[in-house]
Amino acid sequence: MKKYLPLLAAALALTACSTAPESTTAPMQTPAAENATGEESAAAFPIGELRAYNDWMPCTDTAYYTLYNQEGTTNLVGLKLDYANGVQTKVMSLDLANDDSYSDWFVTNDNVVRVFLANEDGSEFRFKSFYPDGRSEERTASQEITPVIYDEYAAYVLRDKYVGRLDWQTGEVTTWSASIPQINEILGVAHNKVVLTRIVSDMPLPTDHEMYEAVLQNSLMEYDLYDVSSNTLKKLFDEPYYPEGGGSRKSYMGYRGDMLYFDQSRPDGDDITKVLWGYDCSAGTLQELYAEKSTGCMGGYSTPQGFTRSGQLEFLFLQSTLDTLHIYKTANGQVYKVPYHDPTLDAAYGNAENYGRPIALTGDGRVLVTDGYVQRDGYPTDAYSLIDLDAYLSGSTDYTPVQMWQDE
């Protein structure tokens, strides 16, 4: 059975802040772990529009991409929905008969899409690129890496003491030394800066499980910006490793201007309150922007999600009732109740209404939403439509259907 490559997950894009309390240049150290082809400087390479891998953004301002396994075959099919003409087309088909695993899409801002592949015995790690003009090419990587960010030129892996770079054109992996002690998670990227968290403790984290947990009790979770081009790390803010009051850790949702947005679930008696936080990079302050109890909120579509246009966060889905989405618009700080219907709430998938769930935001200000079904390989799958953002937030369901691809 084919499986996804164990690539590290990340969340959505976010911005470079204009000011931050700390800035340190990473000292030159000997990189550990993976054996790379050579030691380089970050300044030796071009930097494009950085994105986080698996940030739920298989899209650009002009197109939305999906992957699916073709029923009864070993084929992996890639589809592209062009926002301009509202037509979904097939852009790739890969026969995975001789491959053991593969990654999700790596979609760059220039609408080039890539997939990582590995054979069954793990002896070969490669990637295939698909270009807007219909060309495709496959390259073997000089070594296996687990990319967490990428741009038009390369994919990157970040470690405590080094950064590895896989060149899309050559397949070569090079490294430079870095100092990102006890890196915990990659949260997102924007303007060529990577937002991440680090564990800050009084002592190095031990390998013994009980001692490890004991150290974490008195540790901090620090939110930082790492600049790939200058190899510098800046602190944003920190909080206890285990949030006070039993709340969840803050999940990054996206940015608009100097404001970074985070979602958090906070216990409130027998209930839970959903809290939206904003970190103002220019002021260096963290503030509560909106809070709402989750009483009566449920639904198959329940994971908070941010939607961006040209990298800027336009709106956030917070939570839902049975037939309404609660959506926060960053431009004015208002919450809108938007009608939708999620088929996962019904006993039989495909036999009920399916509309209004946001999928992506186009560069010209329209929302891609679910709207009914199409049959694919004998099974129902979501159909899509487009609607103006302001009309969508006002409750309109006057959708314009797109032309979904059908297998011949």
Residue ranges, per PLM feature:
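Repeated scaffold domains used in trafficking and secretory/extracellular systems
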Residues: 49-60, 98-109, 141-152, 180-191, ...
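Surface-exposed loop/turn elements that mediate protein-protein interactions on large endomembrane-trafficking
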Residues: 38-48, 73-95, 120-141, 161-179, ...
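Conserved active-site beta-strand-loop modules that form the wall/rim of enzyme catalytic pockets
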Residues: 223, 251, 258-262, 274-277, ...
